[in-house]
Every structure is written in structure tokens, then in C-alpha cells.
Amino acid sequence: VNSAGPSGGEANGTDATAAPDATAAPTATADAGAGAKAPTIAAVLPGGGARGAYEVGALSELLPALEARGERVSVWCGTSVGAINAVAFGSRAHLSAGEQTELARALWLSMRKHDVIARIVGIGGVRTMARAVGNIVGTPGAGVASLLDPSPLAASLDRWIDWDRLDANVQARLVQACVIATSLTSGEPFAFVASADGPPRLYDDEVRYVGTRLSGEHVRASAAIPVLFPAVEVTHPRRAAGYYADGGTRLNSPIKPALNLGADRVIVIGLEPFSFGGGRPASPRGPSIADVAANMLDGMLVDQVAQDVRRMALVNSFFVEDVATGTLHSPRSYRLSRGHDPYRPISYALVSPRRHGEIGRIAQQVFQRRYGGFGSLRDIDYTVISRILGSSSQSRGELLSFLMFDQEFVAELIELGRRDAQRWLRRHPRFWCRDASHDLNVGDVDRGVLKEQDALEEFRQRRR
């Protein structure tokens, strides 16, 4: 149960079955009129390596449209590459929406692979690969924890992000920023929160909130995809010191931190469609290493976001009801009868590609144009990665899209994000929506559907 509201009923278990977590929050102003405070708007940005360019493209359309309505994003929550985008936008919260998005676009178009990972083909890269294989087969003294070396990212983040400006914007209450990473000591997701009010003061059995001044180590920890990149040591604050990996590995409800930071409305950028159905076509042969790896990465970085969006939409369908026709047994009447504020639906804006695997197809096309044939001389690393993944693999493009920090690929993703955001704005002239069936192909739901959601969540918690 999300206990982002001011009352503490959910935290002490008095109303533990009122709603699934991360989907709705009790509020004293649920039915407020003209005197209500301005809504707090959050952006939730998932992980995906070079796919983060898509997020920038979508935001380049959404943020100016939001500003034209007199609204701005004041809560940025990110995981993995979404954490990089979150702190980048947070550090520019003092600028106009147009300036923010133009700087973000310029940053992404300037990124290169060597800004993020060390060369694969070369003495250092061969040594890293050899030590990784040694670890797998149990060679004594192998001593490496990843296939790739992301050491260049530390210096790059300090070039890309003005950490002092981010902190100044936080202290001026222009923005709250939240970076998610997974503790390798406890297995829990940690939300490193930069907020003038400190972290959320509530009980949460899924996410631990830690107030801090954000720095490169928090972002690198959030982006440490297991196996690909090594775990990152976080040294501050001391009470949360330890080694961390990618924040998407254990976070079942990516939207939840944004709501617990006070968000009334959320923008969620997805890297695969949010709607039900679709997916990769079945392969007539057995799965390749690329197929397996792509499914693993989707499970960590994509599926949880889509599931949480669907859960939010289902709960919106359940809790949006006509006050005049509500019955004694309705969720609204039930909560009021227990002395709690009524739940409210969460308005949202959702942007994602129209088709499953669209970003992977673009990566494959760009790779063929840029690095096929004699083009392999541009960057032999991409050719080596492609050979390892297999030239006939349907999932090769999916995996390349995580690592292809190529200007042409980045430009195409920015443009795709722009088009998909424009599509959302055409369908939603008032920007926000809360109709599940309209956006996710979800029909009307009843209590039985939500009971199944609760049972699934209970199973998840027991399994953890």
C-alpha cells in the first residue's frame, strides 16, 4: 500500500488491503476545489543504456507543452541511464523548458562510447574479458566482476552534470531528485533522495529512502547493470555505505518513489509499449545468447515499469467513481467510514514506442549502415560485440541499443521520442489522462482483478 499521504493508517496496517502499492495515495485535498495547491509533477525515467536518448526526445516535446500550461516537473526519479537524465534535468531546473531540453539534446548528441566504457579491442579490453572468463571457469586470481569496463563514466558524469547547481536547485526547492540503486548487502532497493525536506518519512517495506547530496557515485551505482558492469561502492551517506548495482534489479514499483515524494501527476517514459500484448516473435530455432540476454535486460529494466503503469491504470479504473452514486461498500465510502482520506486517481502522461522492439530495429538498421562491411573500421568494438551476439539473432539489435552511443543512432532515438510524445499530445490535448481503457487497452475492472494483483504482490514479497 502506498502511504505517500499525510495520514499514517497504511503504515501501521489498519488498512492494508485498500489498494495495491505505488498506484494511489490518500490525500486531504482529493476533492479540493479552486483553493487547492498546484499539483506536484514527477517524471519517472527507466534504464536502458544508450536508449536514454529516447527519453530526451520525448521530454523535448512534453516539457514545453507542460510549461505552456503553467506547470513544471519538480520531481525527477531515475534508474540506470534514467538516473543520468534525472540529475541532468534537475541541475537545469532553474532554466526554461526549452533551454533544458536543448542542453539535454546537445549532451546526448555529443556522447560517444568511450565516454561510457573503455575500449573492448585493446590490451585493457582483452585483459578484462580474459579475467571475466577466468572468473566464470574458476581461475584463481581472476578478480574481475564484469564483462565491460565503465571507468570512463566517472569523469564523464562530472563533465556532464553541474553537481553544485543541482544542489542549489534542490535547496531553492525548485526540484527533488531521486536515484534508485540496489544494495548488494541487503538486496533492497535504495532511493538516494536530494530534497530540501529530506527523504520521505514513512514506512516502506520495499524501498529504503536515504537523504543525501547526490553525486556521480550514486548515479554510477544506479547504472551498474549486473554482469555487464561492476558493482559501485557508495561512500556517502555513511549509514548507506556499501556496494550497489542497477536500481532496476529489485524494484517492483518504479513509480512508487515519485508518489512518496509527493507527486500528484506523473510522466512515465517507456522504452517498450505499455499496452498489453505484443512482444518478440518466437524464433524457429533455439534461443541464442543474445535472445537470453535481451530477455534478462528487459526483465530488469523494462518489464517492471510497464507492469507498474498497468497497475496504476487499473487502480485508477477502480477508484474513479461518481460520488453521487457511490455505495456504502465503495472504496471511497469504505475509507471515509474508517476515518481515512479517500484515495485519489493519479493523472499521468505516458510515452513509449508504438511497436515492441522498435528501438532494437533502429539499432540494427544503424549498425548495418554505419558498421557493416568496411564501416567496421569506424569502431571495431561494435563489430566484435555484433559477432559475439550473432549476425542472425533477432535480439542483436536489442542488445546493441544498450551500448550504441553513436551520433546517428542517438539522433534517430531523439526523433522517435519526439514523434511518440507528439502522438500522446494529439490524443490528449489537455496533456493529462487517467483512463486505463483509453491508453492501455484495459477494459473495466472489478475487485476480482485487483484481488489477483494483491495476491501476486504478496507472492513477490514472500519470494523476496
Describe the residue ranges of each PLM region.
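Helix-centered, glycine/charged polyanion-binding patches within enzymatic domains
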Residues: 268-314, 347-349, 359-361, 366-377
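C-terminal helical/tail subdomains of lipid-metabolizing enzymes
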Residues: 144, 157, 324-464
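Intrinsically disordered, low-complexity terminal tails and inter-domain linkers enriched
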Residues: 3-36
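Active-site periphery "cap/insert" segments of enzyme catalytic domains
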Residues: 144-181, 188-192
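Alpha-helical membrane-targeting segments
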Residues: 116-148, 293-304, 308, 367-403
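Active-site gating loop/helix substructures
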Residues: 171-301, 386, 395-402
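Patatin-like phospholipase
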Residues: 36-44, 49-151, 157, 193-208, ...
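C-terminal amphipathic alpha-helical segment
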Residues: 297-337
